[in-house]
From Swiss-Prot:
It is found in: Cytoplasm. GO terms for molecular function: ATP binding; CCA tRNA nucleotidyltransferase activity; tRNA binding; tRNA-uracil-4 sulfurtransferase activity. The lineage of its organism: Bacteria, Pseudomonadati, Pseudomonadota, Gammaproteobacteria, Enterobacterales. It comes from Klebsiella pneumoniae (strain 342). SUPFAM superfamilies: Adenine nucleotide alpha hydrolases-like, Rhodanese/Cell cycle control phosphatase, THUMP domain-like. Catalyzes the ATP-dependent transfer of a sulfur to tRNA to produce 4-thiouridine in position 8 of tRNAs, which functions as a near-UV photosensor. Also catalyzes the transfer of sulfur to the sulfur carrier protein ThiS, forming ThiS-thiocarboxylate. This is a step in the synthesis of thiazole, in the thiamine biosynthesis pathway. The sulfur is donated as persulfide by IscS. One of its GO terms (cellular component) is cytosol. It is an enzyme of class 2 (transferase). Residues 61-165 form the THUMP domain. This is tRNA sulfurtransferase. Belongs to the ThiI family. The keyword Mitochondrion does not apply.
Length: 482
């Protein structure tokens, strides 16, 4: 099988040296993402495209899907690479591939050619188009706005029959820009802002301020791991968790009610800046949008920024909430965000929307900053690739099984789309579908006399959810890994 990777247009307008560097980085990213799919896979870079070749046909859908989620790729052409001897030979190889798709449709032929030939691209379009029109009675040529466009590429003595075109996510390859640290909460905003910086070529590390115990951290780890695994797995990244409950307690005790929200955000920026400096990260990323809540007015944002020299990026600053939710749905984080626990440890009854610097600094004089230093020093830092292993260790009391007993039932916790694409069928046992994002509210409605074997494709989500259900008091759960 062969795929032709077309570059994001902004890459092609760079200077020669920058363009070559971007293409080289993108080629490396593709290799890193695809290396586990096929050992024979080859990635070859060219000036205007990248080729991916593999032999394992069973991996075709997985490779194609993975390519559509790598930043820097505009679109992917799935092609059949065959030799040809003449114009008529090109037509004969095109006809069987496109006959069914063109029946009853209008069409045109578009050709791109590289190398020296006795014919022009237009001559190929006319010859092949005329032949298809003659041999498919219900098809009709239409050069403008046709139902189907037959795309052919000719490279020297090889014909690339384009079997399908798939859109990528665009942007710049990860690694072409410097690292950033995303302040992730698991909600709509922070997930989308993290994705936007990945798409712009940054390696995104994650910093989580835990205000709500283990269950909250498990949920946020799921979001971070999902984003990394889906869009950024070409690079190693960190997940830093800071226990912020002592800081919240100090704020509640020492800070005036109206100033609490801004002071909390300033403490978070201070802590995140220390983490960023420790790991050589150039900027922080937040999901703040102008005017969305009281701490996100221009006055308050300026005061929050003032506590650190570290650059703070806010990619969603002008976005509406509805648009942010649409983006979350598009990238697959909406379901996580909708079910994420909300912890409102610091909510002022009358929060200020126009904080005064002198008042904020006066309130912060009451704060014991050794508490902030201590929680930053004690912050946990893990490689995001180890989240699965750490979760496995954390749920050691939850048995992992390869088979099932008479009183067992399998619980498929994948998303609805995944279940529809690949339905789980196991003989001899009941299989029940309950997406992971409904477990917190719906698991208790299931037959609790049964033992439920949680299953997902990679096993990460099932282990995370097993730990969550254990914490909620359910002992009748196991992890199913056949």
């Amino acid at each position: 099988m062969k795929f032709i990777i077309k570059l994001f247009p902004e890459i092609t307008i760079k200077s020669q040296s920058v363009r070559l560097r971007f293409i080289k980085i993108l080629t490396g990213n593709i290799r890193n993402v695809l290396k586990n799919y096929d050992e024979t896979l080859a990635v070859v870079r060219h000036w205007d495209h990248i080729e991916v070749r593999a032999k394992d046909e069973n991996q075709r859908p997985a490779i194609r899907d993975a390519l559509t989620r790598i930043p820097g790729i505009h679109h992917i052409l799935e092609v059949e690479d065959v030799p040809f001897t003449s114009l008529h030979d090109i037509f004969e190889k095109t006809l069987p591939l496109w006959r069914e798709a063109l029946e009853g449709k209008t069409f045109c032929v578009r050709v791109k050619r590289r190398g020296k030939h006795e014919f022009t691209s237009i001559e190929v379009e006319r010859y092949v188009g005329g032949g298809l029109n003659q041999h498919i009675e219900t098809a009709r040529v239409k050069l403008t706005d046709p139902d189907v466009t037959v795309n052919l590429e000719i490279e020297n003595d090889r014909l690339l029959l384009v079997k399908g075109r798939y859109e990528g996510i665009g942007g710049f390859p990860i690694g072409t820009q410097e690292d950033v640290l995303s302040l992730i909460s698991g909600g709509f905003d922070s997930g989308v802002s993290s994705y936007m910086l990945m798409r712009r070529g940054c390696r995104v590390h994650y910093c989580f301020f835990n205000l709500g115990g283990a269950a909250h951290e498990i949920g946020v780890r799921q979001v971070a791991h999902y984003l990394w695994n889906r869009f950024g797995s070409s690079h190693r990244v960190r997940f830093v968790a800071i226990n912020f409950e002592p800081v919240v307690g100090e704020i509640l005790e020492k800070v005036d009610d109206g100033q609490m929200g801004v002071v909390l955000k300033r403490m978070m920026v201070r802590a995140a800046s220390k983490v960023a400096e420790r790991y050589g990260v150039q900027a922080l990323v937040t999901g703040e949008a102008l005017g969305q809540v009281s701490s996100q007015t221009l006055t308050n944002l300026r005061l929050i920024d003032n506590v650190s020299d570290t650059l703070i990026l806010r990619p969603l600053i002008s976005h509406d909430k509805e648009h942010i939710i649409d983006l979350a749905r598009e990238i697959g984080t909406e379901d996580f965000a909708r079910t994420m626990p909300e912890y409102c440890g610091v909510i002022s009854k009358s929060p200020t929307v126009k904080a005064v610097k002198a008042k904020i600094e006066a309130e912060e004089e009451h704060f014991d900053f050794s508490i902030l230093d201590k929680v930053v020093e004690e912050a946990s830092n893990i490689d995001i690739r180890d989240i699965a292993q750490q979760t496995e260790a954390a749920v050691v009391e939850v048995e992992t099984v390869t088979g099932f007993g008479a009183n067992d039932a399998i619980l498929d916790i994948r998303s609805i789309d995944e279940q529809e694409d690949k339905p789980l069928k196991v003989e001899g046992v009941e299989v029940v579908s309950l997406p992971f994002y409904k477990l917190s509210t719906k698991f208790g409605d299931l037959d609790q006399s049964k033992t439920w074997l949680l299953w997902c494709e990679r096993g990460v989500m099932s282990r995370l959810q097993a730990l969550y259900l254990r914490e909620q008091g359910f002992s009748n759960v196991k992890v199913y890994r056949p």
